[in-house]
């Protein structure tokens, strides 16, 4: 264990858990240039996670009126803070949904009519109505 404390490659990661030292300080990987850029933030994250109990990770708070974006490039401020869905009159009506709903309504009405006519006939003959 002392060889890791004296090794210069692991020197910045003395406070990180032993299991994370290899992942944080691997210089033989093809991503070593990217790793060197992210070492300070990764080390701060590792220290932050180990200083709290498991499951007590601090949630990232967003300012009021902002929402997280699932994009790889930054967006301008007006685009990033626009509402999640526009007003309904701005949308074009979806004909497939309209046809589906009307088809179900007319199908239920037709089915009720087909079933009710024989039932009405049977009960009218049965009760001499």
Curated annotation (Swiss-Prot):
GO terms for cellular component: mitochondrial inner membrane; respiratory chain complex II (succinate dehydrogenase). Membrane-anchoring subunit of succinate dehydrogenase (SDH). It comes from the Eukaryota. Pathway: Carbohydrate metabolism; tricarboxylic acid cycle. It comes from Oryza sativa subsp. japonica (Rice). Residues 25-80 are annotated as: Disordered. Residues 25-35 have a biased composition (Low complexity). This is Succinate dehydrogenase subunit 3-1, mitochondrial. Keywords: Electron transport, Heme, Iron, Membrane, Metal-binding, Mitochondrion, Mitochondrion inner membrane, Transit peptide, Transmembrane, Transmembrane helix, Transport, Tricarboxylic acid cycle. Heme binds at residue 87. PANTHER family: SUCCINATE DEHYDROGENASE CYTOCHROME B560 SUBUNIT, SUCCINATE DEHYDROGENASE SUBUNIT 3-1, MITOCHONDRIAL. GO terms for molecular function: electron transfer activity; metal ion binding.
């Amino acid at each position: 264990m002392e060889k890791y404390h004296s090794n210069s490659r692991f020197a910045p990661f003395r406070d990180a858990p032993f299991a994370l030292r290899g992942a944080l300080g691997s210089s033989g990987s093809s991503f070593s240039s990217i790793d060197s850029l992210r070492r300070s933030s990764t080390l701060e994250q590792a220290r932050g996670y180990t200083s709290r109990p498991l499951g007590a990770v601090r949630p990232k708070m967003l300012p009021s009126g902002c929402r997280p974006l699932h994009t790889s490039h930054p967006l301008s401020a007006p685009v990033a803070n626009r509402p999640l869905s526009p007003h309904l009159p701005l949308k074009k009506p979806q004909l497939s949904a309209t046809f589906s709903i009307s088809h179900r309504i007319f199908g239920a009405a037709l089915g009720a009519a087909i079933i009710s006519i024989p039932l009405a006939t049977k009960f009218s003959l049965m009760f001499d109505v």
